[in-house]
Amino acid sequence: NGRPERNFEKLHSAKKLMSLPDEEITLTETLKQHGYATVDFGKAHLRKDPKSYGFDEAITGWVRSYYYPFSKQYEKTLPAKKGDYYTDKLTDAALDFIERNKDRPFFVHLEHFAVHDPIQGRKDLVEKYQKKLIRMPKQKGPEYILEPNPDGPAISKDELKKLEEKDSLEIHQEKRVWWMKQKQDNVEFAGMLE
């Protein structure tokens, strides 16, 4: 990864793998054994079809634009039209998956691309943050790409509340929501703990 080894530091360069070894048992494979429906939406560095890691459904890959058309690979898997925003469409797909699997346990792995190139915020959010961006010369636009819904990242609190209030879903007592950050530091600081 380009980082020189230094005896006085606790971080050392990690061996890079091109994909997860087949003998590794994944969380999704374990969940499927226990009757869970599993889905992977968004950014994934798996190098192989996510279904080979235990996902029932997957909509993954790179985007050329956050506005429709996103890229050719999404034409069949993520229906969209002119003006649609990629982050919102992935969130809609996740909500649809939850609705379709409301009568069984499910696992949704949703990773938005929003903080990766190309940096293209939703137009209404770009306008909202224009004044603040003037004071941010080193980072042009991180806040408007991290706010895909009015209340925050991924599925908003309002959407979760709507899901809880729908008696037909009956998932509110069994739901677990994990917010996780992808650890992807700048290359100059990459490595792993001893």
Locate predicted features:
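Active-site-proximal cap/lid insertion segments
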Residues: 3-4, 58, 62-194
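Outer-envelope exported proteins of Gram-negative bacteria
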Residues: 39-42, 49, 107-111
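Short, glycine/acidic-rich beta->alpha junctions
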Residues: 19-23, 40-41, 89-90
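Short Gly/charged-rich anion-binding patches and loops
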Residues: 26, 45, 93
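Active-site environment of divalent metal-dependent phosphoester hydrolases
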Residues: 46-49, 117
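Residue-level detector of functional hotspots within protein domains
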Residues: 41-44, 178-179
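Active-site segment of extracytoplasmic enzymes that catalyze sulfate/phosphate-ester chemistry
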Residues: 1-26, 30-36, 50-53, 57-72
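Residue-level "edge-of-site" marker
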Residues: 44-45, 63
